[in-house]
Amino acid sequence: FLQAGEQLKGTTVELMKMGEPGVPTLDAFINSNLKKGEKIGFDGRVVSMDEGQLYDEIAKKHEGCIEYSVDLIDEIWTDRPPLSEKPAFDLDVKYTGKTVAEKLADIREKMVEAEADMHVVTTLDDICWTLNIRGDDSDFFPLVLSYALMDEKSYHLYIDERKLDDNIKARFAADGVVIHPYNDIYE
């Protein structure tokens, strides 16, 4: 908060130090500031379903509505750099301890215990760990931008396919990993 406090001095932006005493949560702030009939807009790709439902409840309480297909930053950040196209790379089982097939079997066991038909994976480290791959899409962590959906038979990986060489693609196919274009997760 120190840097933000310094950089916001003299602006009209008020720093809200979330988690500190007397500072409202985001939903409490919205609830107390939303006027009758107003709309709450957010990018539904980056808000959990629980948060989205909470915002919908708040909006309805104020006779308003939500708009979850809004990415205002995309509209104004015209020189935004493209997503990384750096290739993913394999990690040998001697470093990972288990094959992808073994990890998928372990996860499926946990899914059965939890009576889950589908497992949604959005954390990059979980995806990379499960698939024994790493990448260079972050300056600080060896991760690959991707999403995954897993069911009892398949593991659906949403990734820029250009990141995957033929060896990784063949290994994925053998392990039941189905590759989809990165942005298809939103379809």
Give the positions of each predicted feature.
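A composition/biophysics-driven feature that prefers long, compositionally simple stretches
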Residues: 1-187
